[in-house]
């Protein structure tokens, strides 16, 4: 099991400072969707450059253009990127391939998925290794 800190409502500098203060106690630091919307991928980059022990998760909630969006998250320092479980299979497969190409991880967020058990099995067959409900 891994402990994850989600940071959603700070600016990127405050988020980086908080992450530095807690990184020895957590495994993953998440830059939440609100920060990414407000500050863009440079927020991921600043966090990535500010910590060295914990993984950086970019909560992008990708729906389409998945391989491109994962490549950009990785470029800015994300170790883990999120995609929505309701995205098309082709998008999820492309995101998984892109993440794995860079030795990074993809987390599939099961928000709004109606049949979680069925979708989890489908995602497992696609090669997804991290699921979140």
State the predicted function of each range.
Residues 47-95:
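Glycine/small-residue-rich loop that forms an oxyanion/phosphate-binding "nest" at active or ligand-binding sites
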Residues 27, 79, 129:
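Receiver (REC) domain switch/active-site residues of two-component response regulators
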Residues 132-133:
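Conserved small/polar residues in nucleotide/adenosyl-binding loops
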Residues 1-67:
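Conserved N-terminal beta1-alpha1 strand-loop-helix module at the mouth
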Residues 24, 76, 126-127:
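Structural motif
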Residues 108-116:
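Active-site glycine- and acidic-residue-rich loops that bind
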Residues 21-22, 47, 73, 99, ...:
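Generic structural signal for hydrophobic
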